């Protein structure tokens, strides 16, 4: 074994920003961090966008950051995972969707695509619908109908028309698909058992009943004329030759391309559940091959799931337990779930040999009132744990730069960064004393940008800035490589500990010898 303990120190919300304006990390007096960056191996790491499994350009967050770190691999969120599968081509081999397509061929029936038409990326993404249409075309389907749910909540209130125009152009380009109905998400995507709303969407899709229009564009124009924006568009059936373009019938297939479950459950249940009784279905229950993009609700029968949840096997915590090593997780209340539940891949139960210390966060209305938060207590517990000779690995978090950064109050954020700097110094002294090793990083940025550089308004969100990776008191002569991400940290620690990285971890050690 190597040096002991190995400490992973996470400075929450501590990003690195070239612009020193409204930048608490640059403006604070940080003699410890300044010295560490000069004297020890230091590089900038990526903690946002695709590097952490989020859409390109999206700021990181604490949950995603800790999950990527603990997993030792990039954990793709549903949105990026599906987008990536479309790009890689795996999407077109999806068994559940192929089953829906086969059903259409076997019964000479129609494929219906349901979903929220927007690029909001919260419940769905319009490019995923294009993927489904492309798949239908490749498999020779002709009767393909789209039932659009309009957004206006995760997107601008009247952006729906633009999305419809883009879809119509895309269907022309792909050579398949017709819009059969449109409904605002207020009706089709209720989640509070307001079944009267869902019934209106159901009646448009299944019965061909409701408002009518000659085209999707006519429908949206008429709605805007009445000052009814996307979210609230009354379910409208598109008519061709005095008949609905299409309604959902027995033996048809459905692919519902929303990936977030909560607002997809009710309309799905109204079609799939043979015992459904929340409103009257004039045609009763009839059989369809119904594919949900993700598992909306295990209690909904008669459905298939295209993208099952990926279980994160062999996290760092599990790996340490398998090797009989003792580990400690330490944080104050605000970040306790992050160093435990999220770091363990969404598992609540501690691993064998995993101790946990929770220090209470201060009871103040907002953390600018106490920018040091509970860092001094957390820091003292850390020093004690380092010197105890009890732990092989310590994983801990200082919450200040993030929690105080969220207030947008620069003066307080500077104090928060300074409080953390002092605690880092104490930990470094302790590590040197026992000849342990420490990797310092952050899960995402925040305190390094406290105003919007374009508008001058306070900026309280996370950032897409890089974060520090510093290796303290490890073996002489090691260097860290540039261009790494959070998923590479645990593979680095495993190498530092002289152990073999498990196959499930696809992150790559940052160590350059």
Residue ranges and their predicted role:
Residues 1-513:
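Feature captures the catalytic ectodomains and active-site-proximal regions of enzymes
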